[in-house]
Amino acid sequence: MAECDWDTVTVLRKKGSAAQSKSKQAVTAAQRKGEAVETSKKWAAGQNKQHVVTKNTAKLDRETEELSHQRVPLEVGKVIQQGRQNKGLTQKDLATKINEKPQIIAEYECGKAIPNNQVMGKIERAIGLKLRGKDIGLPLEACSKK
């Protein structure tokens, strides 16, 4: 009779599945019980985000100082605008030529965009002007054969 202990409790209940724990009902029930609930919002879920900023935004949020990401200089925006107009392209035409959204071209021209080397390279080739380095605004030389 040593195995007959009236103080031990056996719980015959399975743990809920992942789908159940993600539901709104399960989250509110857990909050009512006082359990720890961690929620996180999916960023850009269901959208086609091709060029995501690779800078560490969480690290930037933790910093106490006033820090912000470097933006495209206005000088580069003016060069893009002039090069585009010299080729007779609208923002929409340039965007379709480089497979980007017109909004991205507008952001680069206004100086609001965070520089992305892929996008900058596409724009450089489309308008034929350098946008990076020290020779900003000079014509892009043809690639020399190796």
From Swiss-Prot:
CDD domains: HTH_XRE. Residues 80-134 form the HTH cro/C1-type domain. It comes from the Eukaryota. Signal peptide: none annotated. GO terms for molecular function: DNA binding. Probable transcriptional coactivator. This is Endothelial differentiation-related factor 1 homolog.
